[in-house]
């Protein structure tokens, strides 16, 4: 039962943080596409670690992460309005690079698959 509740809370907080980032942060420098991949809320509901994926080059990712880090307190305040919990968790934004790593591995596998076809001929 506890795992089910934790999963529901994680999903609800994820939806709320995603909505806040997309709709409520009014910074003209936020032009990259930002996706909230996963949110882990601690058992005591004090902290929420949000993993985000940012589309763009490294400089744009760094700039976007700096903006999001500075907006953590605003996101927490808005999260308190959006999700009714005993405590409003402190939001910690982390960059998730798993999608880029997966794409890199796929490219390597395709390259290997292509070289195997050429070797068999």
From Swiss-Prot:
Lineage top rank: taxon: Bacteria
Q: Which GO terms describe its cellular component?
A: cytosol
Instruction: Write down the PROSITE patterns for this protein, in alphabetical order.
Output: RBFA (PS01319)
A single Gene Ontology molecular function, please? Answer: ribosomal small subunit binding
Which cysteine pairs are covalently linked by disulfides here? none
Q: Which InterPro entries match?
A: KH_dom-like_a/b, RbfA, RbfA_dom_sf, Ribosome-bd_factorA_CS
Q: Where in the cell is it found?
A: Cytoplasm
Q: Which UniProt keywords apply?
A: Cytoplasm, Ribosome biogenesis
Q: Which residues form a coiled coil?
A: none
List the Pfam families hit by this protein, alphabetically.
RBFA
Q: Provide the family line.
A: Belongs to the RbfA family.
Q: Which NCBIfam families match?
A: rbfA (TIGR00082)
Question: What's the stated role of this polypeptide?
Answer: One of several proteins that assist in the late maturation steps of the functional core of the 30S ribosomal subunit. Associates with free 30S ribosomal subunits (but not with 30S subunits that are part of 70S ribosomes or polysomes). Required for efficient processing of 16S rRNA. May interact with the 5'-terminal helix region of 16S rRNA.
Subunit and partners = Monomer. Binds 30S ribosomal subunits, but not 50S ribosomal subunits or 70S ribosomes.
According to UniProt, the name of this protein is Ribosome-binding factor A
Q: What is the lineage of its organism?
A: Bacteria, Bacillati, Bacillota, Clostridia, Eubacteriales
């Amino acid at each position: 039962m506890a795992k089910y509740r934790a999963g529901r809370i994680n999903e609800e907080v994820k939806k709320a943080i995603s909505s806040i980032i997309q709709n409520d942060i009014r910074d003209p420098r936020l032009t990259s596409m930002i996706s909230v991949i996963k949110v882990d809320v601690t058992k005591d509901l004090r902290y929420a670690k949000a993993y985000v994926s940012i589309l763009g080059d490294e400089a744009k990712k760094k700039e976007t992460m700096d903006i999001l880090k500075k907006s953590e307190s605003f996101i927490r305040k808005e999260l308190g309005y959006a999700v009714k919990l005993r405590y409003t968790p402190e939001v910690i934004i982390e960059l998730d690079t798993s999608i880029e790593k997966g794409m890199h591995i796929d490219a390597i596998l395709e390259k290997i698959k292509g070289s195997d076809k050429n070797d068999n001929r």
